[in-house]
Amino acid sequence: MKNPDFPRRGALLLCAALALAPAVALAADRAALEGDARRALQKLTSTVPAANALSKDAAAVLIFPKITKAGLGIGGQYGDGVLFKGSKAVGFYNTSGASYGLQAGAQQFGYAMFLMNDKAVSALGANEGFEVGVGPSIVVMDEGKAKTLTTTTAKDDIYAFIFGQKGLMAGVGLQGNKITRLKD
């Protein structure tokens, strides 16, 4: 004899599985992103002494392990990242920006932002996201600045390091990028 509840139970189980599938996929994506971010931060701090020194004093570190930038006259860039306080991942973010002018090409890179105080960390949660260049002071580190930086001379709110550039496109900048927290 057939069980009259079987089709109903099967439909209920199917609906539950479909409802949970996006959450499982999101958790897997975030776990992969966190792993990529941890590896990128470890590589950066092991190869750049200034990044290593800042990581020890930073209130938090926001790292975007892979950002893709492309343009032909009009360009854009996008990537996802992780905010770490100590060794704990406390939030997931994305960064995006648009640009125009003389540009052509595509590239990938990553960047890490060492947030040195609570003011810098709070700016991430303010309003509808954080726009680079508006708010706390940011210093984008190059090789020369990195060699002269010490923990006693580090007085700015945020220090950013760009790393792992691949591809052909002149100029990588952070000015005008918007950083937004991803929903949990």
Place the predicted regions along the sequence by residue:
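Generic cytosolic/nucleocytoplasmic N-terminal low-complexity/intrinsically disordered segments
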Residues: 1-2, 42
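Structured alpha-helical
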Residues: 3-5, 20
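Intrinsically disordered, low-complexity regions enriched in serine, threonine, proline
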Residues: 5-6, 27
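N-terminal export leaders
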Residues: 6-15
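Hydrophobic alpha-helical transmembrane segments of integral membrane proteins
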Residues: 18-19, 61
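Sec/Tat signal peptide C-region and signal peptidase I cleavage site
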Residues: 21-27
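Small-residue-enriched, tightly packed secondary-structure blocks
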Residues: 27-184
